[in-house]
Amino acid sequence: MQQIMSQIRAAVDSYQLIQSGDRIAVGISGGKDSLVLLCALANMRKFLPMKYDLVAITVDPCFDNIQTDFRQVEELCRRLQIKYEIRRSQLGNIIFEQRKESNPCSLCARMRRGILHDMSKKHNCNKLALGHHFDDAVQTFFMNLFYGGKIGCFSPMSYLSRKDLYLIRPMVFCEESKVESAAQRYHLPVVKSECPVDGHTCRQSTQELIKDLEKRFPDLRRKVMGALQRADIDGWGKQK
């Protein structure tokens, strides 16, 4: 976890993601990324110069109208002394039964994020932290290029004026392999995704493509990240 926290600190310093007095909602999907982020931010409160509060929030899509079991995540939050709220929803039913979406991931992400925004404001948070990591950023760059025909990526930090809420991604310098290792080493209670298309998404296909490309172009992911920062695409140019 030490390396993860060091890389989070680098992102926090580079993009001024956290300031003293912040109240941060951490979006918890139950996956390894969000759980590692939660634990890291909780531990970093002990030594970061800025003082901040944390709340954990989850949107349960209730796929097949079945509530996901988050009891082990609740226990983790109790140990960390972090308030935790689960919002049960009908996202699974809306996306797969009512709308029958051909591209369900995009709609699900938008709807889930909208609920997370509302939950963040309910808990008087001024920031929402999501667990997107280094590899997510590189994959998003390629997905925007291949599927959207544009150069772009999500931002390390963005401001949602309609909600008066900052969206931050403190793990953008953390490689997925290191995140996975941390989750395993600390026996974090990862919740298996029940999404019907899990493992068969555009992001999964893009991830496999990047692996193939790196056989011919070593260090491709690092070069993409460097390009995002040097060109200051979508706020990736380091602030200091």
Annotate each language-model stretch with its function.
Residues 1, 109, 199-202, 206, ...:
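Generic structural signal for well-ordered, non-membrane alpha-helical segments
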Residues 1-139, 147, 177-185:
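ATP-dependent adenylation/nucleotidyltransferase module used to activate substrates
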Residues 201, 219-240:
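A short, charged, Gly/Pro-tolerant segment at domain boundaries
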Residues 61-63, 91-93, 158-161, 174, ...:
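Residue-level detector of flexible, active-site-proximal loop/helix-junction positions
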Residues 109-121, 157-163, 210, 214-229:
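Short, basic, helix/turn surface patches
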Residues 127, 135-215:
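Catalytic subdomain that performs nucleotidyl-dependent activation
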Residues 95-98, 202-204, 233-234:
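Short, solvent-exposed polar/charged micro-motifs at secondary-structure junctions
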